[in-house]
Amino acid sequence: MKIIFMGTPDFACPILEALNEKYEVSLVISQPNRSKKKGQYIDTPVAALAKSLGLNLFQPETIKEHFDYIKSFEADVLVTAAYGQYVPTKILNLFKKCLNVHGSLLPKYRGGAPIQRAIINGENVTGVTIMEMTKKLDAGVMYAKKECIITNDDTASDIFSKLSI
């Protein structure tokens, strides 16, 4: 089975590693590297991992105009984890199955920054959801959920680490 993986932050790295151990990851798509200081760029965590694993890496500003390039990999499955961009339906339709690993217990905290919003709202529990992707954001069939306790000392980074394992 050939997979295209889309992700950007540390949260997504263990997911990419696990997929790479069991399947053929044809392409990794991550957000473009951003400037840390003037003229200096740092790889996104997923980009750094993809490079270290010797995987094909693509970092477009947006993916919507890269349909033909993505299609050329002839992958069966798309897996996303904190990619940071909406994936157009035209691209979703290239795959037999599209899965998203989302950093909340859906349907709560759909969309971006779910971990940060859980902390801001004083939640004691959050989690991760594996779901089917549809054209509506974070609204597909949910296949699995795992809870995670939020302690008073937890930062967003701590929770990212707990959820990405």
What feature does the model see in each segment?
Residues K64-E74:
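Short amphipathic alpha-helix with an adjacent loop that forms part of the alpha/beta core around
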Residues V25, N56-L57, C98, T126:
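Hydrophobic beta-strand scaffold residues
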Residues M1, A48-L53, K71, V77:
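Catalytic cores of RNA-modifying enzymes
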Residues M1-G39:
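N-terminal Rossmann-like dinucleotide-binding module
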Residues E21-K22, L53, L94-F95:
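Short, structured coil segments at secondary-structure junctions
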Residues V77-I165:
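Donor/substrate-binding cores of folate-linked one-carbon enzymes
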